[in-house]
């Protein structure tokens, strides 16, 4: 069986917001206004927008993605973090401990969040069925080679996230997408060893260490 093609999607800067923070910015009792579904089941683009402000700059008209989250999370690229003057901390979604904060602005309302600004670690969403086919485990890290134009890249540290609520796709930010000259519908494939096993970071590290020890 050949390699499974994984759709690669580019995530521009956006925010996941808690109900409490949303009401502080848009008014008590207000709800997110649905605009369109996203590729992952249950996720959607909302009509409401915010401005993100840091010590050195701002980004206006930043998209909010629904539904509400337990805690507000702002996802930027490393280039974005440098532009507004906040530390670029690479994390998996939901892991916001010890991350920088920023100011959120909606009209004449402002809210300072103490943490929650992250650079999302590149990752693949897949179902348990996909994982069985590719012989992968949740939170395993793999190599993915992109298939796009004449600037294909091999990405390491790609986290596998498995749930029946997911649809197969790899998510990268705008910095990463620009690096491999993303086309209209880019795809990637998980690299395999010669025996057909998934080429994981641990296997790669073990092979290097084995070579050093020879």
Regions found by a protein language model. Give the residues of each.
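Short, charged beta-turn/beta-strand-edge "cap" motif at the junction between a beta-strand
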Residues: 110, 148-151, 194-198
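Mixed-charge, glycine-accented linear interaction segment located at domain edges/termini
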Residues: 179-200, 207
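Generic N-terminal segment detector
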Residues: 1-6, 213-214
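Short, solvent-exposed polar/charged micro-motifs at secondary-structure junctions
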Residues: 43-45, 198-202
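Short, well-ordered secondary-structure micro-motifs
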Residues: 155-156, 201
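Short beta-strand-centered segments at strand-helix junctions
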Residues: 7-55, 60-107, 112-145, 156-188
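Helix-rich terminal scaffold detector
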Residues: 203-214
């Amino acid at each position: 069986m050949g390699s499974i093609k994984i759709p690669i999607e580019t995530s521009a800067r956006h925010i996941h917001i808690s109900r409490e923070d949303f009401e502080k910015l848009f008014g008590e009792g207000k709800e997110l206004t649905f605009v369109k579904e996203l590729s992952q089941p249950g996720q959607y683009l909302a009509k409401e927008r915010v401005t993100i402000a840091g010590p050195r700059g701002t980004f206006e008209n930043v998209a909010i993605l629904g539904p509400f989250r337990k805690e507000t999370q702002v996802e930027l690229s490393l280039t974005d973090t440098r532009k507004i003057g906040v530390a670029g901390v690479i994390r998996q979604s939901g892991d916001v401990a010890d991350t920088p904060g920023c100011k959120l602005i909606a009209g004449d309302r402002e809210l300072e969040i103490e943490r929650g600004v992250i650079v999302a670690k590149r990752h693949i969403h897949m179902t348990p069925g996909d994982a069985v086919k590719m012989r992968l485990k949740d939170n395993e890290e793999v190599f993915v080679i992109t298939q796009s134009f004449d600037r294909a890249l091999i990405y390491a540290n790609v986290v596998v996230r498995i749930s029946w609520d997911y649809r197969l796709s790899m998510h990268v930010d705008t910095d990463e997408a620009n690096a491999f000259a993303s086309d209209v519908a880019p795809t990637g494939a998980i690299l395999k060893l010669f025996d057909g096993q998934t080429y994981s970071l641990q296997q790669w590290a073990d092979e290097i260490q084995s070579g050093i020890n020879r």
